[in-house]
A protein has these predicted regions:
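Catalytic cores of enzyme domains
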Residues: 1-154
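Glycine-rich phosphate/pyrophosphate-binding loop
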Residues: 149-168
Length: 168
C-alpha cells in the first residue's frame, strides 16, 4: 500500500509462484549468478537465499533499471553439484521438488526420500558447490533471526511423533 501511495501506481508481490523466472530476474538485478544447479548464488549468502519480486506499473527506467543482462561467469562449471545430486541417475526431478510434491508419491520417489533422509527440501547440490562452501566457511549467517530459531539439525521419526501440529 505504501508503494502505491508513493508512486500512484499498482504493485504486486510474489514469492515462489511468479510470472517471472525468479533466478534469472534476480541475476539481472545484480543479486548473484546462476549456477549449473539453476540456483542463484549470491556473493554474501551463497545459494541459501529466498527470492521475492515486486512487479509494478511504474516503468523500469523510473526505478533505475538499466536493462542489463544477468552476470555471466562466476559459476566454476566444475560439475560438483550435478555429481553430488542423488537424482541425476534416476532421471527424476530434484529431490527438493519430490519432497514438496503435492499429492501421492510414487514408490520410487518415496524410496529416494527414505534413502536420503529428507523430510523437506534438499541441499546436497548447494553444499557441494565450491562457491557456496566459501560462504559457509566464512560463517556468514542470515540476519533474519526467524530462520535461525528452533532449528532441528537431525530429524528422527521419534522427533516427528513428539511434535505438535504447530511445530510440524
Amino acid at each position: 500500500a505504501r508503494l502505491e501511495e508513493c508512486y500512484g501506481r499498482h504493485f504486486w508481490g510474489f514469492a515462489d509462484k511468479s510470472p517471472l523466472s525468479e533466478t534469472y530476474t534476480a541475476a539481472c538485478a545484480g543479486l548473484g549468478i546462476i549456477g549449473d544447479n539453476h540456483l542463484l548464488i549470491n556473493e554474501k549468502y551463497g545459494s541459501f537465499v529466498f527470492i521475492g519480486e515486486i512487479l509494478s506499473e511504474v516503468p523500469a527506467e523510473e526505478l533505475g533499471y538499466d536493462g542489463r543482462e544477468p552476470v555471466t561467469g562466476g559459476c566454476l562449471h566444475c560439475g560438483k553439484c550435478k555429481a553430488a545430486c542423488p537424482m541425476t541417475e534416476s532421471g527424476m526431478d530434484c529431490l527438493s521438488a519430490v519432497t514438496q510434491k503435492k499429492g501421492e508419491l510414487t514408490p520410487e520417489e518415496a524410496a529416494y526420500i527414505r534413502k536420503y533422509g529428507s523430510a523437506w527440501g534438499c541441499d546436497i547440490c548447494q553444499t557441494s558447490c565450491p562457491l557456496v562452501r566459501r560462504v559457509t566457511e566464512r560463517g556468514t549467517k542470515t540476519p533474519i533471526e526467524f530462520f535461525c530459531r528452533d532449528r532441528i539439525s537431525m530429524l528422527t521419526i521419534e522427533r516427528v511423533h513428539e511434535m505438535s501440529d504447530e511445530e510440524f
